[in-house]
From Swiss-Prot:
GO terms for molecular function: ATP binding; nicotinate-nucleotide adenylyltransferase activity. This is Probable nicotinate-nucleotide adenylyltransferase. HAMAP family: NaMN_adenylyltr. The gene is nadD. It is an enzyme of class 2 (transferase). Pfam families: CTP_transf_like. It comes from Gluconobacter oxydans (strain 621H) (Gluconobacter suboxydans). InterPro entries: Cyt_trans-like, NadD/NMNAT, Rossmann-like_a/b/a_fold.
Amino acid sequence: MRIGLLGGSFNPAHAGHLMLARRALRALRLDQVWLMVSPGNPLKPSKGMAPFRVRLASAERIADGRRIVATDIESRLGQRFTVKTVGLLKQRFPHVRFVWLMGADGLAQLSHWKRWRRLAAMVPIAVLPRPGSVSPALRGAAASVLRHQRRPSRESPVLAERKGNAWTFLSAPQNDISATALRESGQFRPDSDQE
């Protein structure tokens, strides 16, 4: 089984996340994408962050529950750091081929993550475009350090077969919807269940 892990705050989950998940399913020939809702991103301020259950519910609304699955597994594992979560998932599911999915904005910030080089060695990474983030991401510290591990996008269908030390940039239409814009417009109220 091949599973893409799309971690994030999902404050809220939106059509852009769904578009990225669908693109990853096709390009990487994945069986599933897990929308892993973070219990608390150490790099994001807690001010304005909706309660975990509200963010999980927003991810569940965009997931189909079959190929795109919203999950609280990071919370259940008691983790907040991706490198620890991925390590535990690989132990619990030794026959699953995981791929870490991230937007270009995530790649631009990757060098600030805890043990990010270890993460890149543990699991292949697929990066998807985000408006305004592609160029800074590809010129950033992580992309520079990992430049020799970058695989051409034509190899994306077999990326999941690698154990790590490989990443690719997938082309995809860019959707400029953002969780920040949804919160600022009042379409998502962090203090409510939105039901």
